[in-house]
Amino acid sequence: MKTARAAVVAALAALALGATPSSPPVRVLVYTFTYTNFTTETIHDSGINAPAFHAPVSGVAESRAADSDLGTITVEVLRVQPDTGLIVSVAEDAHGHRSARPATCVVYGNTNVICDPDVRVNTEELSLLRLRGSNFVDTNQIDAKNHWRVDQSGNRMSDVADFSIDKNQDGMLKISSTRILRETDAIGFVSTTNGTISYDWGRLVPTSVVDDETIRQPGSLDRYSTVRTQTSLTLIRDSAAAKTP
């Protein structure tokens, strides 16, 4: 992991000095994306604090907000690290307000992504980058039921993702996924993401991704929020169909 962080630092230092890349990107991938987000704030009222001249009232009050966008995401593969990590640049061109300037990241087959902390990387960009590692589908990790698990839990966070290959047609894989991200303290949030992935095993690249994430976040007493985010991505251009960095 230190190697990955050092690679990001080195790449950012070169950009800061105005350095021009000595060679073009190894590979350029362009995806279309759609993004929708629904937030619901729920308040449970017991009626205990109602004024004396009113009868106690109990119930549930909800407020909702929605957001959406669409556009393209471009991933440039800059080089491959000795530890198999890929140094990439990712940028988003949205029709609405979610456009994001290029960010330098290192991606691994175990879904780990390390990006420049000073540049915003959107949810839909991360959904793609998590699957961009060269050995994302690793035969050494797949069990007899065509399933594998990635556990990246830490001291305060449980992060477990399960992947299952539902169909393999001449190297074109249909993969279902479930990721549960949970804070381990009593008031932490819980994120559950169900997804489907179309993956070209020959080119080592996802060709389409659909994620449906629900986050439940406790607030103050009798209050919590639910955020549902749906993203879809479809590969529309691959500059290196014959090369698989």
Model-inferred region functions:
Residues 9-20:
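Hydrophobic h-region of N-terminal signal peptides that target proteins for export
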Residues 20-245:
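Signature of exported/secreted
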Residues 1, 16-18, 154:
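Short, flexible coil/linker elements and helix-boundary hinge sites characteristic
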Residues 1-8:
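Bacterial N-terminal signal peptides that target proteins for export
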